[in-house]
UniProtKB/Swiss-Prot annotation:
<protein>
    <recommendedName>
        <fullName>Antimicrobial peptide defensin 3</fullName>
    </recommendedName>
</protein>
<keyword id="KW-1015">Disulfide bond</keyword>
<keyword id="KW-0044">Antibiotic</keyword>
<keyword id="KW-0929">Antimicrobial</keyword>
<keyword id="KW-0964">Secreted</keyword>
<keyword id="KW-0732">Signal</keyword>
<comment type="function">
    <text>Antibacterial peptide mostly active against Gram-positive bacteria with atypical up-regulation of expression.</text>
</comment>
<feature type="disulfide bond">
    <location>
        <begin position="46"/>
        <end position="64"/>
    </location>
</feature>
<feature type="disulfide bond">
    <location>
        <begin position="29"/>
        <end position="56"/>
    </location>
</feature>
<feature type="signal peptide">
    <location>
        <begin position="1"/>
        <end position="22"/>
    </location>
</feature>
<comment type="similarity">
    <text>Belongs to the invertebrate defensin family.</text>
</comment>
<keyword id="KW-0211">Defensin</keyword>
<dbReference type="InterPro" id="IPR001542">
    <property type="entry name" value="Defensin_invertebrate/fungal"/>
</dbReference>
<dbReference type="GO" id="GO:0005615">
    <property type="term" value="C:extracellular space"/>
</dbReference>
<feature type="disulfide bond">
    <location>
        <begin position="42"/>
        <end position="62"/>
    </location>
</feature>
<dbReference type="GO" id="GO:0042742">
    <property type="term" value="P:defense response to bacterium"/>
</dbReference>
Amino acid sequence: MKFAVVSFLLVALLGLVAVGEAQLKNLACVTNEGPKWANTYCAAVCHMSGRGAGSCNAKDECVCSMT
């Protein structure tokens, strides 16, 4: 029974982290600070999530690329 509860909590926590990361990734390129700051923030989000380098595209989306 404890295993089931711990497993459920772990899956729920991982789900929250994934949703939070997706929201950060979507908001990374929308800023009033300018494109240089947005690209730096996007690159940091991609790097911290283990997805390599990142940059903002023309649609203001943060795109991570494994290199």
